[in-house]
């Protein structure tokens, strides 16, 4: 549950080659598709769903979500294109997070805690979300500890749109 999309993609790619070779060997041994006992089912086009158009705003974090939803959103879009939010009028990409069981009374999207040499936390609709890695525009990914030192964060700063 802690893997992000890139890590999962790498793991699947590592094993896909072996499985593909097994599958191709199986097909090579078959005389006809009927030998495979595959059942073909036509798609019911009335039940088909289409995705929405992906835009830049698709990757913006909605802090009005639960801690788990935001954590999973960051995991899904980590690295490329990366989930992002606006902090002090600057776009910050959030690369890695961790769920917590801390609840804050501060407004949603507000920095609730700063743990030097570790992380900072942001209020969500239920629990605080620990931010572990971020990326500033044009800069490499950095730990939250490095970001805290350079950005001069303080409790009460707020992520916005």
Specify the residue positions occupied by each region the protein language model found:
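Active-site-proximal loop/hinge segments within enzyme catalytic domains
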Residues: 1-100
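An anion-binding loop in the catalytic cleft
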Residues: 58-161
